[in-house]
Regions:
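IMPase-like, lithium-sensitive Mg2+-dependent phosphomonoesterase catalytic core
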Residues: 30-93, 100-102, 113-375
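Alpha/propeptide regions of enzymes that mature by internal proteolysis
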Residues: 106-111
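Polybasic, lysine-enriched low-complexity intrinsically disordered terminal tails
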Residues: 1-38
């Protein structure tokens, strides 16, 4: 072949390769720009602090005084302190039992007492709080009267799942904020309100990261603690639970003590290839259910015929978050947040989670075709 033809033949693939390289370069630039744009969106979301979010929510109410915002901010401060102590619980030698029992007759874990003290001290200085109620205390604590500016009651479980600390399982703080009625003289009567009366609720999960879940009645929102700056940052606005997911969370060790309907439901899940996920820490189990979907159950048992979870500061705040995320919550006989409590430590059965999954439980365990759970 003549040299000219050989050169011509060689030039074609070289030209094509150059064209491909140029095209590939343009494509990479476009992809890089899109990726950077996506990263900017994520970073922008993550740079919304809890405090900024609270101020944003406050603007929904022209007459807001900022007092509720201060309470939520104070709870976030307590959460940071507790998160640090939970991470160092073994190093600081505060793991294990305190050697005493709480008002429920349950052995107190040392971190229960420490967490309770932290929250009481942080919230006790807020002039807008009239009453504090804790799982660890027999009676609600009166801080000030309504006539002295006490507009709110705060109820909380300082450290749910604390018995799991020695195995590094996720634990959490649960809280709810109620309005204080100055016309009601007794603290117990004041805090005994239906869950539907809650004005804010949330929980803090101390796990692989520290997560702060919050609702003020306008969606459920997720924040995560950035320890490098010491702030909770928004990672998910208006979280929505999946409508269904074949996952159930229940302590099957109590199966023989469940009412027949609940035993039938568990048998049904086995036949229908459901996955079982149960940690034994309510905050961790509900958080997984809220994020991934499924159903969390704590039925009545022979040992606890009225249920085991506390209505006012465990079931109600979790139900508020669940409903605001599009889920359902029931005691088995009615919507959880419609129950009128009679005492601070009142217990209740509980079923909550994805709407379709709660409906399955109600259909099998209670013979209800479809659970509307009307408000």
């Amino acid at each position: 072949m003549p040299a000219a033809k050989m050169n011509k033949a060689k030039s074609k693939p070289v030209k094509k390769r150059k064209t491909k390289l140029v095209a590939s370069g343009v494509s990479k630039v476009k992809k890089s720009a899109r990726a950077q744009s996506k990263r900017k969106d994520v970073v922008t979301d993550n740079l919304v602090s809890l405090q900024s979010f609270i101020i944003e929510e406050e603007q929904r109410y022209p007459s807001a005084t900022g007092e509720l915002s201060w309470i939520i901010s104070a709870i976030s401060l307590a959460a940071k302190i507790i998160a640090f102590k939970v991470r160092h619980v073994r190093l600081q030698g505060v793991i294990g039992q305190e050697g005493s029992t709480n008002v429920q007759g349950e052995a107190q874990i040392r971190m229960d007492v420490i967490s309770n003290e932290v929250i009481m001290r942080v919230l006790g200085s807020r002039p807008s709080i009239a009453v504090l109620g804790s799982e660890e205390d027999q009676e609600p604590t009166i801080l000030r009267k309504g006539s002295e500016g006490g507009k709110y009651c705060v109820l909380f479980d300082p450290l749910d799942g604390s018995s799991n600390l020695d195995t590094a399982v996720g634990v959490g703080t649960i809280f709810t904020v109620l309005k204080n009625d100055p016309n009601i003289p007794g603290a117990m009567e004041t805090v005994c309100q239906r869950g539907a009366e809650q004005i804010a609720a949330g929980y803090v999960l101390y796990g692989s990261s520290t997560v702060f879940m919050l609702t003020t009645g306008h969606g459920t929102h997720m924040f995560e603690l950035d320890t490098s700056v010491g702030s909770f940052l928004l990672v998910k606005r208006d979280l929505q639970i999946p409508a269904a997911n074949k996952v159930y969370s229940v302590n099957e060790a109590n199966l023989e003590g469940f009412p027949k309907g609940y035993r039938d439901y568990v048998a049904w899940t086995h036949r229908n290839n459901y996955s079982s996920r149960y940690i034994g820490s309510m905050v961790a189990d509900v958080h997984r259910t809220l994020v991934n979907g499924g159903v969390f159950l704590y039925p009545p048992t022979k040992k606890h015929p009225s249920g085991k979870l506390r209505l006012l500061y465990e079931a109600n705040p979790m139900s508020f978050l669940m409903e605001q995320a599009g889920g359902k919550s029931t005691t088995g006989s009615q919507r959880t947040m419609n129950v009128m409590p009679k005492q601070l430590h009142e217990r209740t059965p509980l079923v909550m989670g994805s709407p379709d999954e709660v409906d399955h439980v109600m259909r099998i365990a209670h013979g209800v075709k479809r659970s509307s759970l009307k408000r």
